[in-house]
Amino acid sequence: MRVLASHKHERTAQAIKEAVAAIISREVKDPRLGFVSVTKVDLARDLSQAKIYISVYGSEEDKKNSFIALNSAKGFIKGELASRVRLRIMPELYFVEDPSIEYGARIMEILEGLKKEAGENESES
């Protein structure tokens, strides 16, 4: 029974992720909202809270403005979510910055730098 409950929990989190992504991209009309993507949703066991991980492409100012826009549209997003995903209790939404894409980009920069250094060292030898 535990595996079934876990699977249902994952499906619910995925449904929330897809719905929130669609709402943000198509319904939220705030000019402060930059290029954002929903990367992950962590759902509390009792479905009372949903941490929505957001990746924002752009400068620190773009990130700040995007999170301000998301937090001001939180009520609207929750209402739209309630009409799209049928849950007995609609979770409280929390938008959290997901640094994983930036982290991955930084790793790629480091690897490219190492690759260039290795190429320069081979040409000097």
Swiss-Prot record:
UniProt GO cellular component terms: cytosol
Pfam families membership: RBFA
UniProt keyword annotations, A-Z: Cytoplasm, Ribosome biogenesis
InterPro entries documented for this protein: KH_dom-like_a/b, RbfA, RbfA_dom_sf, Ribosome-bd_factorA_CS
GO biological process assignments: maturation of SSU-rRNA
Stored PROSITE patterns: RBFA
Keyword Acyltransferase applies: no
Annotated localization: Cytoplasm
MF-aspect GO terms: ribosomal small subunit binding
Main location: cytoplasm
PANTHER family in the record: RIBOSOME-BINDING FACTOR A, CHLOROPLASTIC-RELATED (PTHR33515:SF1)
Function: One of several proteins that assist in the late maturation steps of the functional core of the 30S ribosomal subunit. Associates with free 30S ribosomal subunits (but not with 30S subunits that are part of 70S ribosomes or polysomes). Required for efficient processing of 16S rRNA. May interact with the 5'-terminal helix region of 16S rRNA.
Complex formation: Monomer. Binds 30S ribosomal subunits, but not 50S ribosomal subunits or 70S ribosomes.
Membership in a protein family: Belongs to the RbfA family.
Record protein name field: Ribosome-binding factor A
Organism: Carboxydothermus hydrogenoformans (strain ATCC BAA-161 / DSM 6008 / Z-2901)
